[in-house]
Amino acid sequence: MRRKGFRRLPGFPASIGIAHPRHTASTDSRQTMIFYFSGTGNSLVVARELAKRLNEPLVEMASSHTAPPYVSPDAQAGVVGFVFPVYAWGMPHVVEDFLKHYFRLFMPKTQTHAPAASPSQSARQNALPSAAETHKPTAARSQTLSHGKPYVFLALTCGDDTGKTPVSFKNTLKERYGLHVDAFWSIQMPNTYISIPGFDVDKESVAKKKIGDAALKTAHIARQIQKRQTGVFDVKVGKFPNIKSHILRPLFNAFLSSPKRFHADVSVCTGCKRCVKSCPLANISLQKHTNAPATPQWGANCTMCLACYHSCPHHAISWGAFTKGKGQYRMKGIEQGD
């Protein structure tokens, strides 16, 4: 099998990637936090930089349901941010699950749910700003937060475009929690999805440029958040977003997201456990063999982040026949288990 070399490209500047606790209680009366999910490190490095610049704690969505909430019932709302990658032009399954079942644990008890939207309201909710298609940021304005209302932002990482992901996220927060999203951004990062024909990791020159541009944009985003700018929609939605998110995405979920297709080549695998440590959902275990190294086994709780594939130092992991001969990528400075 032809294998491309394992590459760790230079990450963000040295100021980025400072370690932050996954769950850190804030002593400020205005509760602030950034919820994030990351597979290969693209979203994590963005979330860490925003947390450092904004002095906010990070909360990992993949494991936050196991940690006690730390939002006091009478706390004033501050900044609530979300950083995660776009998977198949939508939210990763783990993010959808968090928003539906666990985000409420972090909300003040006085937070009420929004009433169900009328048909006309639903139509407006599914509309995107006309600037979205051309990737031109809409005008932003400064706003002083009212008591109890958080400033909510979404920063998406993606290899190219987002499809209707911002709309799906916006509607979920509005319908379940009555929260309004004040600002949206998308940040292009090196491509990691390689599980279908024609998809591979970016060339090194392309990946380096994306990382450099992403570092600059992340700093700009932090400044906009510090000013509490609202009405921001700086997102590359891409062409045919409805087709991608509403037709292609269900097909991806039905036929291209099963962990049953993962396989480890026993002639190459050394049982080093890097795949186990890299899985954000603890979905991989090692199965012992007689007279052979233990090999990974995948459970059913998979969000198709491909961290296991990209983290294997021996390129022993494949997903069906679609990943044969393709490259690997993981953000430099992100350790196994981060």
Name each region found by the language model.
Residues 264, 274-297, 303, 307-325:
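Iron-sulfur cluster-binding cysteine motifs and their immediate structural context
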Residues 329-337:
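Active-site-proximal loop/hinge segments that shape catalytic or ion-binding/gating pockets
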Residues 27-34, 40-45, 53-64, 77-84, ...:
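FMN-binding flavodoxin-like domain, especially the glycine-rich phosphate-binding loop
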Residues 239-277:
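A mid-sequence, solvent-exposed acidic-amphipathic segment
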Residues 73-75:
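A short, aliphatic-rich alpha-helical micro-motif
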